[in-house]
Amino acid sequence: MSDKAAGETKNGNGATTEPSLNILAQYVKDLSFESPGAPLSLRPREKAPSININVNVNANPLSETDFDVVLTLEAKAVDGKDILFNTELVYGGVFRIQGIPQEHMLPLLFIECPRLLFPFARQIIADATRNGGYPPLMIDPIDFAQMFQQRMAEEQAKSAVKS
């Protein structure tokens, strides 16, 4: 049996590194809000508009331990043929990840990191829609684990087709 504690790994110097996930920075990379029919689109409505929301997550290494995780949220409100508003947010975070086994990196980058970014991105979208003259759009919590599993299944299906 090893003296090494569960989850600890050796760094390049042979020293033990405790598993850690730190947020070094959070930032708005892109934010847009369009209300093409304003001010007419701001009038009271008999029924709620249809709101379509798209979510995407990407991650890129910056160094051996630092990663840029980007959460993209797009929301479009439509009433019949009229576009009430269209908003897009690209919100990123720089994460330092150390002492995590390689097999756990993708789930950490595509599930846990966006889960940490989401509340901030959600608030920015809510503020943008409110400042645009509409009720704040409070996006429901997102199941990033399900998104990740779906993404992995799609990639496996693509690689199976290529084989």
Curated annotation (Swiss-Prot):
One of the proteins required for the normal export of preproteins out of the cell cytoplasm. It is a molecular chaperone that binds to a subset of precursor proteins, maintaining them in a translocation-competent state. It also specifically binds to its receptor SecA. Its main location: cytoplasm. It comes from the Bacteria. It is found in: Cytoplasm. Homotetramer, a dimer of dimers. One homotetramer interacts with 1 SecA dimer. Keywords: Chaperone, Cytoplasm, Protein transport, Translocation, Transport. InterPro entries: SecB, SecB-like_sf. One of its GO terms (biological process) is protein tetramerization. GO terms for cellular component: cytoplasm. GO terms for molecular function: unfolded protein binding. This is Protein-export protein SecB. The gene is secB. Belongs to the SecB family.
